[in-house]
Amino acid sequence: MLLIHIRSTRKILALGRHVFPSNAFFSVSSRPSLSSSDEVAAHDVASLLKTPNWEKNSSLKSLVSHMNPNVASQVISLQRSDNDICVRFFMWVCKHSSYCFDPTQKNQLLKLIVSSGLYRVAHAVIVALIKECSRCEKEMLKLMYCFDELREVFGFRLNYPCYSSLLMSLAKLDLGFLAYVTYRRMEADGFVVGMIDYRTIVNALCKNGYTEAAEMFMSKILKIGFVLDSHIGTSLLLGFCRGLNLRDALKVFDVMSKEVTCAPNSVSYSILIHGLCEVGRLEEAFGLKDQMGEKGCQPSTRTYTVLIKALCDRGLIDKAFNLFDEMIPRGCKPNVHTYTVLIDGLCRDGKIEEANGVCRKMVKDRIFPSVITYNALINGYCKDGRVVPAFELLTVMEKRACKPNVRTFNELMEGLCRVGKPYKAVHLLKRMLDNGLSPDIVSYNVLIDGLCREGHMNTAYKLLSSMNCFDIEPDCLTFTAIINAFCKQGKADVASAFLGLMLRKGISLDEVTGTTLIDGVCKVGKTRDALFILETLVKMRILTTPHSLNVILDMLSKGCKVKEELAMLGKINKLGLVPSVVTYTTLVDGLIRSGDITGSFRILELMKLSGCLPNVYPYTIIINGLCQFGRVEEAEKLLSAMQDSGVSPNHVTYTVMVKGYVNNGKLDRALETVRAMVERGYELNDRIYSSLLQGFVLSQKGIDNSEESTVSDIALRETDPECINELISVVEQLGGCISGLCIFLVTRLCKEGRTDESNDLVQNVLERGVFLEKAMDIIMESYCSKKKHTKCMELITLVLKSGFVPSFKSFCLVIQGLKKEGDAERARELVMELLTSNGVVEKSGVLTYVECLMEGDETGDCSEVIDLVDQLHCRERPTF
């Protein structure tokens, strides 16, 4: 147990020494004497402190700008009679002197005050420092280490106000263990702990999940005469709910409900409701909310917000709004967190405009968005690929004095990576530093993953090396991104080297990383190496499922190595892993590839006998095999048998059947299957469109299906507009969505250089009120590659006049093309059109960002930015 194993309060000192090693340069065991000029400066400052509003005195600011801790302590010594002035000056000089700004230097100044015997001043300063450090765990640990040094070197001890403030701050920082250690030292120093302090300790332990320790501590305080109250009961509820131990939480709540002295209040109910929501017990949570009214305890804003978030997390946005509408009539005013939860829920559901509407209502109600609110909106825009409005929000934040945090920049960097601009995201890293923020592991993982996805491995590695500058260690996700990228490039050896580096750093790899490497090794044909890695990872207990084995099976399947596949099935059993549906499906695929349809049916029966019932995929693979061998009637029978066994066909099954019918000259049956597919709610896909196009070409040209090898070329190169229009008409009659079909056709036509026909197709669809953003991107890319920027401008104008907005990618392609052609004026006009069409109001603020995004991505430029980031971080304030 936590409380039993604590033997000495020196554990704080040991922890402090481990994290923050002592610096002999700051030793104050012997205080240096001041020079005559320093003495004069100290007296000058001390005299200025007697004037009114001395904090605003420009002469004083100039005097202290480079004042070191020794001179500052002398000033405080000269003012020792006025405790308030001493504390105010201490905090003020630490903000304005470059030699007293750092937490270590503040602690140095505190040591000098204690060494001068100014204990009363020191105690008051300590209370102020504790409050200042109450938001930063690292600074609090440094301060506690300083307290231990003061005790050891000078025999200085904290007084009761210091201890009480320290307990509260440790509880706020979720440092329950240190709160208890502090309590033990407090007792050892002879202080009688009050009820407020006991509550604080119980709360701190519970917030950290030390509920058993909290219960033991509570038993102790009950024995000495204190009573169980609502505060302590609520703390226990919090501890159990945070640990998702709802059984014990409900027991505590039951006890509280029966005792008058600790009756649950609104906070108690809200905590328990939150706990129930966290484990998915929403009905009980809502029942508890209804019970509150019966017990005379009205739901608070926090109660409603918790329930609204739970509904949003389940995608029940409409119900969340119904609950929101219930708040004001019940006397509960929504706060910034309530609105933020709704905005976040809408953004995750892809309803960005509705989220914006909620934000506008929020401001109208005089509730101003927080940084978390803005982050939710920025995340929504970035996930939708709309980086321009996301950057406008950044400028709005800055204008409204809502300082962006690390999460803000992480969202924006991820957004840039999503639209294929990881280099611009690296530039944003520098902007983050300029804002006084330091990147975290998420920042680096986003950037490295983005660079790896685009194949920029040298820059990714340079960024990996720069993590040390911020004392950030790469984690499993960092290395997995790099390993995955090298594997995709066919560089399995390099990927293996990074795995070795990862292990040497003591980073535990997970199943995803292991499977990624095995997949990469398999793709370069190194089966033995893949097996060796697999067996090693199984022995390390990293691989607990057959996913990695399935990867090897898949490689063998594609090579039609059936014997090796069956041997691998035996190895799965030998390693103690249970074959999954995927394992058997891969075996079926291998047998079909080798032409052994009978064998694939045997595997299907084996699955049923082993209790691993086949799903739609093994059936579909066999159906596909039968169709490929011209046995369409047998495929139909298997499809019927599959449905009789309770397995419904999916879009892949329908796709296979459509292709099979077309290849066997049965276009009518293919169209019937498409109709059935649409009626069951499945969307048509590119493979369906390709098969239908092939069928129409065969029918129109009168080509026999024995000439199938030429059909693909004909479908791509010789499809005439009449055939395309007929295909669109038929798909529409069958109930299919023509958007997907048109995007498919545009892609194919542009690949064959028939961009003008693609343009005509998109314009025809646009006249019917349908805008195909992806199709337009493809057309823009095709035109820009041929430097036909006027065509692009005409299409952009037409789309805007139709009430739609082209994508950021389309604008970007044309603007960059115009710049390369030297047409800066038209490029600038298009940038302004981009801002206007995206509803950007603050054009001047966001213009700098957008123009930067429109510039080309240069590798060298990006490397220079990384070097500059390293240099910026390494600049430190002068130390004394």
From Swiss-Prot:
Pfam families for this protein: PPR (PF01535), PPR_1 (PF12854), PPR_2 (PF13041), PPR_3 (PF13812)
Keywords per UniProt: Mitochondrion, Repeat, Transit peptide
Transit peptide range per the UniProt entry: 1-89
GO cellular component, as recorded: mitochondrion
UniProt entry tagged with the keyword Membrane: no
Family annotation (Gene3D superfamilies): Tetratricopeptide repeat domain
Major localization class: mitochondrion
Repeat (PPR) residue spans along the chain: 159-193, 194-228, 229-259, 265-299, 300-334, 335-369, 370-404, 405-439, 440-474, 475-509, 510-544, 545-579, 580-614, 615-649, 650-684, 685-721, 738-768, 772-806, 807-842
Residue ranges that the Swiss-Prot or TrEMBL entry lists as coiled coil: none
Top-level division of the source organism's lineage: Eukaryota
Cell compartments where the protein resides: Mitochondrion
Signal peptide as annotated in the record: none
Stated family: Belongs to the PPR family. P subfamily.
Name of the protein described by the UniProt record: Pentatricopeptide repeat-containing protein At3g07290, mitochondrial
Native species: Arabidopsis thaliana
